[in-house]
């Protein structure tokens, strides 16, 4: 990212929500609470999945991966955002912006792929219960999770390098609360059609392919559940599927809005509010929806708490 006159940027100013000073205080309090709950919820899942042998299953392996991912994702964004919301200095160094772009995009892309991979585990458990242990072999689910991380950070590396190659017009004010590809493209003083086309193509793969897999898998799960005679069993599965789909829709829907629309239609003002959903809100909701309401997790939590209490 070089200026048109050949000199290099020393940093950027993250304008964020500075045009709404009254909103900044409200956002600071709300986002701080969200961040605390995100830390507590996701750390709980990781610790319980490690400590309780009953949770050493493919499903909880994926859940602990998702929790670790969300923990890193929010920690790479929220502290900087909180400082900017309450401080006068809203700048971020050039290096800091590059690192934030690479890490946040890598983790976000990984989550897109991982959520698509995770639904295969649910599909195998509901639609192929007799073959589940054979299908979800440890080598397979470790490979699936690892592939998600590799794809996510490979995409991030590509996008970061392409952004670094852009020539900027001397403007260093970013209409966002973090360094993200769409607002950075707005600072370029060269034609970004190729960048936007490449970003659109890759985003289709990263976003829409997992969405298609999720829709297909859940349609098969619904068909399998409809064969269950017990109404209580149907209600339980439909309730779980419904809550999962709600979170998935929120995450993918907002990410699709940010990355799969033409650059000339992209509203930076709307974009930063939309980004709050997939960067902060869904990482907080994920542990509540996927695991903390689960009977196995509640049982594991009680065991750990009682064990600590008895040891005193």
UniProtKB/Swiss-Prot annotation:
SUPFAM superfamilies: Family A G protein-coupled receptor-like (SSF81321)
GO cellular component terms listed in the entry, alphabetical order: plasma membrane
Disulphide-bridged cysteine pairs: 97-189
Gene Ontology BP terms: detection of chemical stimulus involved in sensory perception of smell
Residues in compartment: Extracellular: 1-25, 80-100, 159-195, 260-272
GO molecular-function terms, A-Z: G protein-coupled receptor activity; olfactory receptor activity
Membrane topology, from the record: Multi-pass membrane protein
Domain of life: Eukaryota
CDD domains (UniProt xref): 7tmA_OR2B-like
InterPro entries in the cross-refs: GPCR_Rhodpsn (IPR000276), GPCR_Rhodpsn_7TM (IPR017452), Olfact_rcpt (IPR000725)
Keywords on record: Cell membrane, Disulfide bond, G-protein coupled receptor, Glycoprotein, Membrane, Olfaction, Receptor, Sensory transduction, Transducer, Transmembrane, Transmembrane helix
PROSITE patterns: G_PROTEIN_RECEP_F1_2 (PS50262)
Residue positions with a glycan: 5, 195, 265
Intracellular or extracellular location(s): Cell membrane
Known role: Odorant receptor.
UniProt record similarity statement: Belongs to the G-protein coupled receptor 1 family.
Designated name of the protein: Olfactory receptor 2B8
The organism of origin for this protein: Homo sapiens (Human)
